[in-house]
Amino acid sequence: MATIHVDGKEYEVNGADNLLQACLSLGLDIPYFCWHPALGSVGACRQCAVKQYQNAEDTRGRLVMSCMTPATDGTFISIDDEEAKQFRESVVEWLMTNHPHDCPVCEEGGNCHLQDMTVMTGHSFRRYRFTKRTHRNQDLGPFISHEMNRCIACYRCVRYYKDYADGTDLGVYGAHDNVYFGRPEDGTLESEFSGNLVEICPTGVFTDKTHSERYNRKWDMQFAPSICQQCSIGCNISPGERYGELRRIENRYNGTVNHYFLCDRGRFGYGYVNLKDRPRQPVQRRGDDFITLNAEQAMQGAADILRQSKKVIGIGSPRASIESNFALRELVGAENFYTGIARGEQERLQLALKVLREGGIYTPALREIESYDAVLVLGEDVTQTGARVALAVRQAVKGKAREMAAAQKVADWQIAAILNIGQRAKHPLFVTNVDDTRLDDIAAWTYRAPVEDQARLGFAIAHALDNTAPAVDGIDSDLQNKIDVIVQALAGAKKPLIISGTNAGSSEVIQAAANVAKALKGRGADVGITMIARSVNSMGLGMMGGGSLDDALGELETGSADAVVVLENDLHRHASATRVNAALAKAPLVMVVDHQRTAIMENAHLVLSAASFAESDGTVINNEGRAQRFFQVYDPAYYDNKTIMLESWRWLHSLHSTVENREVDWTQLDHVIDAVIAAMPQFAGIKDAAPDATFRIRGQKLAREPHRYSGRTAMRANISVHEPRQPQDKDTMFAFSMEGNNQPTAPRSEIPFAWAPGWNSPQAWNKFQDEVGGKLRHGDPGVRLIEATEGGLDYFTTVPASFQAQDGQWRIAPYYHLFGSDELSQRSPVFQSRMPQPYIKLNPADAAKLGVNAGTRVSFSYDGNTVTLPVEISEGLAAGQVGLPMGMPGIAPVLAGARLEDLREAQQ
């Protein structure tokens, strides 16, 4: 710690910080542009000037840039010195000489750091009367709009995109006061993390194009704290709503998880919530048509059929909340509850959970991944299946440069010096996959092989680290040399990290990862292990348990069960579509509860219209076992009273109560959570994931809307001039209103939107943190349910045989895509322009045998259908395999590992 003196007052601060960060952490306001907590200091904008004095007697002082000045013990500075204030005002005036002053038509207005800092410096009169330089804007793709004339040349965008996210297609061009930030030519930004430019940019140069089409000012949107639903990582988000539509998603700061950044799937993939074809009312089949029901009719009709059924089974979902899955389990009974996951995937999920629970290896939180000094990724294409982990791995690799700089006593915020000292030095990263990955550019070595051979590599590494681990026969000398290099790097690391997951389609890969971690722990290393699952609540569903989807279909096929309730699950993604349709056709009652129109609704007798994550509350558990709560953003029935969309758990519990002729006893979310904990002690911690519905601050609920929210009385004037009462939220501590507490200093961690007096942009998160860039002042939300035990598992001993290609037979290798493999985001219209066209990848040797070239269309039979796809050639894919884009429409993830026998050139 260090003692600094600011305008005559004494403060204790972290001596490792610079003065800007130290003062902001104290709650003092210093304007700045180029500095960002995640990017460090470069001193490019000169906006954060303060007066520094030699000692208490010095009255003259000198101007220094606070972001470039260490907060050393005994520092004397003044923020309010007149010369410093005039200098800061002049800097804004210089920046404004070329700015178009177009706030009324700028989409950043009301959410703009430049506006905030201009007001903070007191600059209110423009003296510049000459020609401004102008730029041509670029088309940067479907996600981001570009308006270069608003640029103040703070350099944040290229520092984030190139130095932090390792993007290669955004740069700065030009010189002196005429510089241009963009691509060499028009085109879609290639980085999976490009959307963060929207929040990194302090002006309106980069804005959210998906928001542009249905634009609202920040102060006119309703927000709620939420969790990204698009993968298993559980990033924290702030969705914004207006007129019953999601308008945008912003990053919600969580110092333990995603801190300042999201991936583009999480930021832009929300369009499925706004689809017009969603089920909005319960419907029941009458012949070939559906008739619309009200809630009471739906409950009574379903209850009558369920009472007559001899056995009702429930099929849950890894994209539904803990509460909804539990409500289904209560309705049908624990013995009749099935997870809705394919048997193989469920076995891998249970294995991953066993490793996390019993392996004795620590599982780091997302942000902690950045602190590891050697990383081995086994079998997982992390950028496509858990993209935010890939961004954290990139920071871990860069830790080498920080380590080298620290050895020379260079502060962690001196980023230019760190980059200069590091000269692209990296901590070792080793990646195995069936083909190229997006992490290959920073990897020390990549291994492209079938999953069996990837697992064998992992087992061999574990054996080389600890000879009591099972040995692997038949390793050739070249590969053994590489293994020796990997072993040397992992053994020499203080904090090695092993990453694997369920998406490779191989239990052996997970076992190999566990063996490597155990071997490293045995050598005394502070080792971590990270498992990536498939869906937002895969881990939660795995902890709940239940039979597999294959078991459920077996119940229907044999006639053992004559009614099935399917919860938020497109079963065609988890099993053969032919088998699913045949099994459902045998059931006298098929009830579907979902917020999306899925293929299985064609087989449904009754459809209950569920609420999406934006219209409901619930708890999900991420890949590290962290339980996190998401909250309802808006009530769709407020805008259209014909809409009947309830939380899945509310539908299912009402149905359960109707069947048993009793009163509904879960009238709010807290009742469901209490019931979950009573029945399943492994979920005891979810009660602490967020405060309950009685939580108040000075007697007030928490506001979902900024206090400047406007137009509420006119919002439904086209329907009726009589304004209805605002929706009442009995489930949570939030109010559907601007009336309520939204103070930055209030004791709360669930924060719907970032705002503080004088801070309207995302930089307002500074005001909610214990120190800038650290944890939230009152603790990061969420609670871990899985902690490493003292003991550990024995080594897994079954080493798979090496993959052998077979003539006339090809095995399907899984390829995942950030844009397209996820069930929900692929429905977003804006995503469909970024999704690749379905393809089949072939090794050049296999292509030659078949007599086909890139672009040739080939056919194969699967599940009773003939599939025809264009060929892509890949040297990385091993012969005897074909690659298919998992999860894309018509290509279910359950296909991974299946074999094809009739691959042939398609008939023209």
Swiss-Prot record:
GO biological process, one term: respiratory electron transport chain
Domain named 4Fe-4S Mo/W bis-MGD-type: residues: 221-277
Top-level class of the enzyme under EC nomenclature: translocase
Residues forming coiled coils: none
Cellular component GO terms held in the UniProt record: membrane; oxidoreductase complex
Pfam family, any one: Molydop_binding
Matching NCBIfam families: NuoG
Family per record: Belongs to the complex I 75 kDa subunit family.
Descriptive protein name: NADH-quinone oxidoreductase subunit G
Species, as recorded: Salmonella typhimurium (strain LT2 / SGSC1412 / ATCC 700720)
